[in-house]
Amino acid sequence: MTEAMKITLSTLPADARWGEKATWSINNDGIALHLNGKDDLGLIQRAARKIDGMGIKHVALSGEGWNTDRAWAFWAGYKGPKGQRQVEWPTLDDAQRSELDNRLTIIDWVRDTINAPAEELGPEQLAQRAVDLLCGVAGEKVSYRITKGEDLREQNYLGLHTVGRGSERPPVLLALDYNPTGDKDAPVYACLVGKGITFDSGGYSIKQSAFMDSMKSDMGGAATITGALAFAITRGLNKRVKLYLCCADNLISGNAFKLGDIIHYRNGKTVEVMNTDAEGRLVLADGLIDASAQKPALIIDAATLTGAAKTALGNDYHALFSFDDALANRLLASAQAENEAFWRLPLAEFHRNQLPSNFAELNNTGSAAYPAGASTAAGFLSHFVENYHQGWLHIDCSATYRKSAVEQWSAGATGLGVRTIANLLTAE
């Protein structure tokens, strides 16, 4: 084992020999990070990425100034999808160390799950991983049901079945109930719905390779929302919450769904499929119908839903949509408290009407006349939320995954959003 490289924090500028703008320097004891009070967490994260890039795989966070957020910022930048890294953590009080350990367990689970190859992580494996994580943190407070394959069709989960039927790996719906009250009749405070497309080829509206090569990550919404529930539980969540993960492959085969197909949903809506690559909304619709039936105070869905959201925000922000201004502001306040980036994008009543079909009530994609793709996707989902004006948040997870490394992140999953959603769930 190599000797650990000591990483210390300093509020003094680097020696002039390192340059006027140096944010880190090397000394006899190791590496010093020079904080300037402007963006200390970002500075630490970017420095950690550089340290990893230097091939230093064993570090000790030493000296004064470290806390949970600073240690976590270092790990966020230091962690990568290849190889092993060892960190000797700074001395923290019990509460801070517990918080750090829970982040390391749960948010690393999210990142590792999203990074897993599609060959290893099919719909059933994703659902089971979620069950294992949540049972691990909540034990007997969790119960669940897994419905898959033809059972979905027989129970009229036709959006999920339609999308997933083209794969040899059957589609799966995980319905999980976290009930810490011990009362089977306790009201459901929140329902969480996640898109779990474990590989998205685009179906017959096939993607080009440049857009398909990262589609193992199209289950990022399901992983993020699962991690958020687990993390909220570690922070003391004492209300009943239900989780719905809509898991499927979107592949091409003789049994795959086709353009022009019409899906009949349980809430009476009919949807014409005019783009098989707009499949995420089709599976989420089934989860949102179940969520609405619980009459919760809060519904949150999370999905890597549209390229339009990434075009607007890049990979730095998650996109937020809601008709409920007060609730949207609460989510944004939670994001600020957790140092995570969310940005609200427009969602208006007219977006619900920008999905015309000649053969069904809705089209699953907007036409060229309605180019606001992220907003029309959110508008589509609203048709499956009973009281869409109040208590519903849609998160288009633009910041879930990066195809290549940048100065603060390795390539792959980020884990962003977990803490914000958990904060919102435990804020009241």
Curated annotation (Swiss-Prot):
Binds 2 manganese ions per subunit. It is found in: Cytoplasm. This is Peptidase B. Mn(2+) 1 binds at D200, D277, E279. The keyword Signal does not apply. Its EC number is 3.4.11.23. The gene is pepB. Homohexamer. Gene3D superfamilies: Zn peptidases (3.40.630.10). It holds the Pfam family DUF3663. The lineage of its organism: Bacteria, Pseudomonadati, Pseudomonadota, Gammaproteobacteria, Enterobacterales. Signal peptide: none annotated.
